[in-house]
Amino acid sequence: MAAAIKTPGVYVREINAFPNSVVEVPTAVPAFIGYTGKAPVPNVPTRISSLTEYISIFGTAPKTNFKYQKGQPVAPVPATRFLLYSSMRLFFDNGGGPCWIVSIGTSTPDTQKDAKHFVDALTALEKIQEPTIVVAPDAVLLDRPGWQGVSQQMLAHCNKMQSRVSILDVYEGTTVRTNTDATDVITLFRNGITDFLNYGQAYYPWVNTSITEDSEIDFSYLDDTLKDLKTGLDEEVTAAFPDANDPKGKAQKDLNNALVAPPPTAPPKPGEPPVPTPTQIHRSLVAVSPLYRSVMEQIKDQLNVLPPSAGMAGVYTRIDNTLGVFKAPANTGMFSVISPCVDITGEEQDDLNAPLNGKAVNAIRTFVGRGVLIWGARTLDGNSQDWRYINVRRTIIMLEQSIKNAALAYVFEANSASTWVTVRNMIANFLTNQWKSGALVGAKPEEAFSVDVGLGSTMTADDVLNGFMNVTVKVALVRPAEFIVITFQQKMQTS
């Protein structure tokens, strides 16, 4: 009731002309979990909006050490391999925007990778409402049981929050599939996840990217085996220049010696040639030594092999911002990706897309003339008519969270007809706008959705007495045309 007016004068009263409205929540705000170059405070979610901001807070990644052995491909030292920084670069290259980072430790060789670190980070994320996607690229660096535990915990976390989904990476996703269940990477992946499947999606295989460039690679990645590389380079020189006095051979051997020479402690004396810098040594060896070029190329190629989850989070962001969350994130390319690590044919994708157990894995494939495309849009719950498609799961989350946030304004309001009408109209207006944007299917709004609330329809008198206001929302969501069948038939000549 308005305050009593006793003093003569003019009084102004403002009356709201419009009811509350539903505001659409963000749909593509990933949360990344992993090891960072710097860890200001572990397990504290931090919001960033660009790669520059990420670097300023968390730093870059230390160099991965590689082992050179004659006659063998160079191999990374597992303790020095971390994926989050490169994955963040792939995320932003594919259209990524604001996101959350949960550092679980520093990316140094002394760090012991542990599944518990990831689980603790998921617990910390429960306090943050904004993220809608959970990604953990470094989880594939754990052993298989550790990876399985983290993947299952990610799905359980999403089920608990009901406001986000997980993008999972296939463990050892660079491996070609086999016909043996005990060794097939997809079968092992499916066996490792069991519950809350509609909140997860996975992609296979991993991808060869162009994230790490030639200018970022040099011989410092081989610190522990540089002497072995020098031996190989010396043998290469001896084979190319049998005459030990050949000036070209001597010059190249001097370069080889410079690889392992300790850095100078003082400037050269007058008349002495300047000591070449590491950059000069690297560039010179790239120009003259096929073996050195091959080793550097192998290092770059291995650093550029990444699990696709972070890139897919960027694709989700790009699709959501340009087309809408209701558009399936498929039949689109991945930026900074050269090729999938494993080539998949249409027949090979049959089991990936529609297995008997429903645990669909979306394929990343190369098509002639079209490049690398994401060729699948299913969740891990492929046997569910409700939750088979990624865009359906994510659209429902958006609708649920948007309406939930708007309905908070009516908690403790009178549980009466006037409130029911207001809530129904508020939700109906929101869904009408979604229908106009293409998120719902129907020739008119009444065919696309319905909103029911009130005594005798969604509530009983007992519900009202106990403080319940039940609202039922039904929506007809857009589903992707996954299989387009075109039938051709010949007809008789008519003239």
Language-model-detected regions and their locations in the chain:
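Short, small/polar-rich motifs associated with maturation and membrane association
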Residues: 109-112
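DUTPase catalytic domain/fold
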Residues: 150-151
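Phosphate-interacting basic helix/loop segments used at nucleotide- and nucleic-acid interfaces
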Residues: 114-118
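Structured, hydrophobic secondary-structure cores that serve as assembly/anchoring elements
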Residues: 1-100, 105-107, 120, 126-142, ...
